[in-house]
């Protein structure tokens, strides 16, 4: 009898395991619009538009307003923004930290690891001896005592301004040129064309790493950290209110190479971001299997076939 009972139990367990997994429930109607902030950097534009394409394929509507880092988390706190995928750490820790501490936002996942975010120089400047943060001060005259940053209020600029203010590395007499990502890149391009020395805020992933021959300076870990990662931040409670979108966001993890490819299409080939990221997804459909595991459309169907159809894949 015991043997028969065990055998029957085993058969029942086997039959249950063979049943298809129950699809997740669709999100409520209040989740149908997903508001994602685009910081305006090319990497931010790439990942935000890629995510928007996937969500649209699942039946969601999306808004991707351009938003400065300094107000992104405030917008999430007052529930005017749901998702922000460009929390660069550790450089932005002081910006997002207060909102994390008071529970206004939640760090959902790390969407990129192995990134760089620090000062860089052209390779010919490295060859001439500027290799480390401690070398910069000795090049003051050649550099016109200037470090090129990006837009005002950016976390990297704030770190550079603090470095100058505290005379770190003897840079108290330097100035930080604040403009924009494109403004900085234009300045770098002109300097390289003229073989002039320049120090600038650089990061990877970014097409600049393929377009320019540059070296990231050593010795700046106390300012920028040893390495960089990028996190997805959601407003407090969002992943619980909209668990299907939350599952997708937790599973969206990128590589440096993937972002470089999308960013190159956007910034150098001048392909509009929605189209560039859609083309990248069509060329790399294998990423969808993991990203969409257990995810459903707005009406509860498996998301993978719907997104593939949206992208024009067989």
Predicted regions and their residues:
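Short, well-ordered beta-strand elements
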Residues: 28-43, 60-65, 144-148, 249
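Short helix-initiation/N-cap motifs at beta->coil->alpha
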Residues: 41-42, 63-75, 175-187
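Pocket-flanking alpha-helical
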Residues: 48, 67-103, 187, 207-213
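Ligand-binding cleft/hinge of the Venus flytrap
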Residues: 51-58, 140-174, 282
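Ligand-binding pocket segment of bilobal, Venus flytrap-like solute-binding proteins
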Residues: 81-85, 155-222
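A conserved helix-loop-strand patch within extracytoplasmic ligand-binding domains
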Residues: 104-156
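A bilobed periplasmic-binding-protein/Venus flytrap-type ligand-binding module shared by bacterial periplasmic
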Residues: 116-127, 228-241, 264-265
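C-terminal functional modules
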Residues: 256-314
């Amino acid at each position: 009898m015991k043997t028969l009972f065990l055998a029957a139990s085993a058969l029942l367990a086997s039959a249950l395991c063979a049943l298809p997994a129950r699809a997740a429930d669709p999100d409520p109607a209040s989740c149908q619009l997903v508001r994602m902030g685009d910081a305006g950097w090319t990497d931010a534009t790439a990942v935000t538009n890629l995510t928007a394409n996937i969500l649209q394929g699942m039946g969601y509507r999306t808004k991707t307003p351009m938003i400065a880092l300094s107000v992104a988390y405030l917008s999430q706190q007052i529930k005017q923004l749901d998702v922000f995928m460009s929390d660069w750490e550790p450089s932005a820790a002081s910006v997002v930290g207060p909102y994390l501490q008071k529970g206004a936002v939640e760090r959902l996942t790390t969407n990129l690891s192995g990134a760089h975010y620090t000062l860089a120089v052209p390779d010919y400047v490295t060859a001439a001896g500027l290799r480390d943060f401690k070398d910069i001060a000795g090049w003051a005259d050649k550099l016109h005592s200037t470090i090129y940053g990006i837009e005002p209020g950016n976390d990297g600029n704030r770190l550079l301004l603090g470095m100058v203010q505290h005379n770190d590395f003897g840079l108290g007499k330097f100035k930080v040129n604040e403009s924009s990502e494109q403004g900085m890149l234009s300045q770098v391009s002109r300097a390289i064309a003229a073989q002039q020395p320049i120090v600038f805020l650089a990061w990877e992933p970014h097409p600049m790493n393929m377009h320019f021959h540059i070296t990231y300076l050593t010795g700046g870990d106390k300012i920028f950290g040893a390495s960089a990662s990028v996190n997805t931040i959601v407003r407090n409670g969002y992943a619980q209110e909209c668990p299907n979108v939350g599952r997708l966001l937790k599973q969206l993890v990128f590589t440096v190479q993937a972002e470089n490819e999308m960013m190159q299409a956007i910034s150098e080939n001048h392909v509009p971001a929605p189209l560039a990221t859609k083309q990248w997804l069509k060329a790399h459909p294998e990423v969808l299997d993991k990203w969409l595991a257990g995810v459903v459309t707005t009406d509860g169907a498996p998301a993978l076939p719907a997104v593939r159809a949206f992208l024009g894949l067989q």
